[in-house]
Regions:
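PLP-dependent class I/II
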Residues: 9-178
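Single conserved hydrophobic/aromatic residue that forms the stacking wall/gate
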Residues: 1-10
Length: 178
């Protein structure tokens, strides 16, 4: 139950780009007291640009559509996440925790740090990512981009087949380390 002193000052903030898998579009909305909304609007107008018109139109159409699609997408994301977590944790030298949000997995590569690939030492997440891309054509984001050295970020916002093929190539890459 809400304290009486908070009534009238509550805010509702909703993200549409994540809920409807509009990756990178950064669109949502907020509802609340006029004074706070004006302050947020002022800050936002000086800090970032506005959402593009295509993203705004897509968000509007998504809100007007059947919400069952969100439930269906969530189920697909969960299936991909669970399959990827299981596969990653079966690869010697790699591990991950089951993510609770978004559609990214932080791949722990510390178990392969110090090993070599074609004579090059895996001394950072950047090196791991570069070699993986160059030789196996799998793109991951090195953890140093998130101040998470020793990790690489994987996305499961693609088809299950793409996720599993990427992991097959990562496993092949890791098996070739010396």
């Amino acid at each position: 139950e809400m304290s009486a002193s908070l009534v009238g000052s509550e805010m509702c903030i909703r993200d549409r780009s994540k809920a409807y898998a509009m990756t990178g579009w950064r669109i949502g909305y907020v509802a609340g007291p006029r004074v706070e909304i004006c302050a947020m609007t002022s800050f936002q107008s000086h800090a970032t640009s506005n959402a593009n018109s295509i993203a705004q139109y897509a968000a509007m159409k998504a809100l007007q559509g059947d919400p069952q699609c969100v439930t269906d997408m969530v189920a697909q994301f969960e299936a991909r996440r669970n399959a990827m977590v299981e596969k990653i944790n079966s690869i010697p030298g790699l591990s991950c925790m089951k993510p609770q949000g978004a559609f990214y997995i932080m791949l722990n590569i510390t178990g392969v740090m110090g090993k070599t690939y074609n004579g090059r030492v895996i001394d950072s997440s950047q090196t791991f990512a570069e070699l993986l891309l160059a030789d196996k054509h799998v793109a991951v984001v090195p953890g140093n981009a998130f101040e998470a050295e020793g990790f690489c970020r994987l996305s499961y916002a693609v088809a299950m087949e793409s996720c599993m093929e990427g992991l097959r190539r990562i496993e092949e890459f890791v098996s070739e380390l010396k």
